Amino acid sequence: MNKAILAVAMVLLLAGCATKPEEIGRAPDLSPVAAHLGMQNNPQFNGYPARPGKASYSLWDQRSSNFFKDPRAATPGDVLTVIISINDRANLDNKTDRERVSKGIYGGGGSFATSSITGAAAGGDMDASVNTHSDSKSKGKGTIERSEDIRLQIAAIVTDTLPNGNLIIRGSQEVRVNNELRVLNVAGVVRPRDISGNNTISYDKIAEARISYGGRGRLSEIQQPPYGQQILDQFSPF
């Protein structure tokens, strides 16, 4: 009995856990710059080619090379702008009606007669039948209505080049306002030909696109149920 009371008390305590103790009274921390690009203590990117140096007494000025160079991102380390303009609407209305009725009658009959030593005869009829009936009904209805409108721009960096020339890009943006941190991430594979002349690309041109827009902080924690309640929801059969 004492163990049961202790278990119930522990569950109630877990239901009140809504935030991590180390985050109480603190604003969410920003991620390190270029954390996913392998940035070291010194400002150098691993695996990226170094910028060519300027030759002494050269007739060609490196500052003039951009006039003839394609401004679009093409090699690891280049930056391009991803334009996200999502305006999706979905209305789904599903209804199912299922009914099954099954009936069955199983029977049998017979007659018998017996005689005894005295010559007296006895007889009778036997009739046995079994009736079965089964009725099953199921009704379901579901309605989904969604509306999303997201318009953002984020700078992404080319992290790698595939053998066929396609580019792998990844971008991240974090903005902290008071104690709430807005996080925007984008990643995917793009074709160089889809990058426009002003070095921008639309989100619908990104293959294997991974776009996330959310946040973390006090407001996000309030919108989520406490950890204890989430555990109860996972194990509760009701």
Swiss-Prot record:
**GO terms, molecular function:** cytoskeletal motor activity
Against PROSITE patterns, the record matches this protein to:
PROKAR_LIPOPROTEIN
Query: Residues with N-palmitoyl cysteine lipidation?
Result: C17
- A GO CC term attached to the entry: cell outer membrane
Signal peptide interval? 1-16
Keyword Transit peptide carried by entry: no
Q: Which UniProt keywords apply?
A: Bacterial flagellum, Cell outer membrane, Lipoprotein, Membrane, Palmitate, Signal
One of the GO BP terms on file = bacterial-type flagellum-dependent cell motility
* Subcellular location field: Cell outer membrane; Bacterial flagellum basal body
Check the record and name the InterPro entries matching this protein.
Flag_Lring (IPR000527)
How is the protein disposed in the membrane?
Answer: Lipid-anchor
Lipid-carrying residues in chain (S-diacylglycerol cysteine): C17
Task: Give the family from UniProt.
Answer: Belongs to the FlgH family.
How it assembles, according to the record, is: The basal body constitutes a major portion of the flagellar organelle and consists of four rings (L,P,S, and M) mounted on a central rod.
Q: What's its job?
A: Assembles around the rod to form the L-ring and probably protects the motor/basal body from shearing forces during rotation.
UniProt-recorded name of the protein: Flagellar L-ring protein
The protein's organism comes out as Brucella melitensis biotype 1 (strain ATCC 23456 / CCUG 17765 / NCTC 10094 / 16M)
